[in-house]
Structure formats: structure tokens, C-alpha cells
Curated annotation (Swiss-Prot):
The keyword Cell wall biogenesis/degradation does not apply. Keywords: Dioxygenase, Iron, Metal-binding, Oxidoreductase, Vitamin C. The keyword Metal-binding applies. This is PKHD-type hydroxylase LHK_00496. Coiled coil: none annotated. Fe cation binds at residues 96, 98, 159.
Length: 226
């Protein structure tokens, strides 16, 4: 499932975040790449040790944990702390699949990457190129969203970032270990949840809706890893 969630951050939040990021010291983005990804990764990244990165990362994670649509889609169990990258002057990231495991900084504690997400912090008119291209079983998807919007997709997807030929593409990117590791099961649960909410708005808590809600939670109980 590839999902676009609009307005995760307000315009004011985006402006405040960008002001901090634009004044920060960036490093070579290959510092967090695996051996294969490092060969095709050409971007800048805010070091995880940076106080600015740590503060903004915590804010992004807190916002997403409290967002009902994101929670329903990702069913987050654990986050790898959100990171920040920047593409400019022809930078790009070739086709790759995210590492299956990410180790929390300074530990041997691993986060399984089930869900990947990119939170856009630049508007489309600020740069040329820079599309996130995600390939899955349903085809090829080119994503370029307004600042403050996020795209969520399975970490098993082959994806790339096209070269940026003008301006700068700034974003936060992250990985989530889900309570439900399989994308097909998460998609089914998400579709059920969305339709349950629509039925509740239209008809209230009918006996049939209570039954559907029970089925949702029993499926989650069956599939969740806690």
C-alpha cells in the first residue's frame, strides 16, 4: 500500500522546521547507507548526532504517532528516529531497497523496517526533479508532494529519488517497525478501519458495525506482534 497523507505538518510548522534545517551543517548522505545503497546515493544528510536533528526528529515522530490516519496505515510499534536529507545540484539516489534492519544509534537494538515514509519539507515549485519513484506490484509511482505532506509505502519496495536540477529538495525520511509486518495484512486492516469509520459517520454504532469492529480487532489480535 502506498498512501499519501496531506497536511501532517502545518505551514507554520514547516517554516519553523525549514528555518532550523537551512541553518544546519549537512554531511554526506552515505553515512547511513548500506554497502549497495552507498554506490547510488548522492545527497546531503543531517548527522544523527546533531542537536537540531535530534530535536526535529522527536517532533516529527511525536506528530506522526498522534496522527490517526498514519497510525491506522502503519500500525507503528517502533520508529527508527526520523532523519533529514537534502538534494541539490544534480544529487539523486538510484534504485535501491531499504535495509531490512536498522540499528538504533550506539546500540545493538535493531528496528525491522516494515514501513518507509517521506515527509516533504519543500514545495514542488521550489525545485525541479527530485521525484520519489516507488516500484511495487501495482506499477511505478512518481511522488512529489506539497511541504507538510507525507507518503507511506512498504519498505520492500524498490525506489529512487530522481536528480534535482534546480533548487533544493528537503525532506524527513524514516522507517517504522509495524505491529503487523506483512503489507497485505496491513492494507486489509487499513481498508477495514477506513470503512468502519465511514459507516459509523453515516449510520452510528449499529449492531452490524459493532460486529465489523470486533472482526477488525480480532484480526489485529491474530496478526499483531507485540
Amino acid at each position: 500500500m502506498l498512501l499519501h497523507i496531506p497536511h501532517v505538518l502545518t505551514r507554520e510548522q514547516v517554516r519553523a522546521c525549514r528555518a532550523r534545517l537551512d541553518a544546519a551543517d549537512w554531511a554526506d548522505g552515505r553515512i547511513t547507507a548500506g554497502s549497495q545503497s552507498a554506490q547510488v546515493k548522492r545527497n546531503l544528510q543531517l548527522p544523527q548526532s546533531s542537536p537540531v536533528a535530534q530535536e526535529l526528529s522527536a517532533q516529527v515522530e511525536q506528530t506522526l504517532r498522534q496522527h490517526p490516519l498514519f497510525f491506522s496505515a502503519a500500525l507503528p510499534k517502533r520508529f527508527f528516529p526520523p532523519l533529514f536529507n537534502r538534494y541539490e545540484g544534480g544529487m539523486n539516489f538510484g534504485n535501491h531497497v531499504d535495509n531490512a534492519l536498522r540499528y538504533l544509534p550506539g546500540t545493538t537494538d535493531a528496528v525491522r523496517t516494515d514501513v518507509s515514509a517521506t515527509l516533504f519539507l519543500s514545495d514542488p515549485d521550489e525545485y525541479d526533479g527530485g521525484e520519489l519513484v516507488v516500484e511495487d506490484t501495482y506499477g511505478v509511482h512518481s511522488v512529489k508532494l506539497p511541504a507538510g505532506d507525507i507518503v507511506v509505502y512498504p519498505s520492500t519496495s524498490l525506489h529512487r529519488v530522481e536528480p534535482v536540477s534546480r533548487g533544493a529538495r528537503v525532506a524527513s525520511f524514516m522507517w517504522i517497525q509495524s505491529l503487523v509486518r506483512e503489507d497485505a495484512r496491513r492494507t486489509l486492516l487499513f481498508d477495514m478501519d477506513m470503512n468502519i469509520q465511514r459507516l459509523r459517520e453515516r449510520h452510528g454504532d449499529t449492531e452490524e458495525l459493532v460486529g465489523l469492529t470486533s472482526a477488525y480487532h480480532n484480526l489485529l489480535r491474530l496478526w499483531a506482534e507485540v
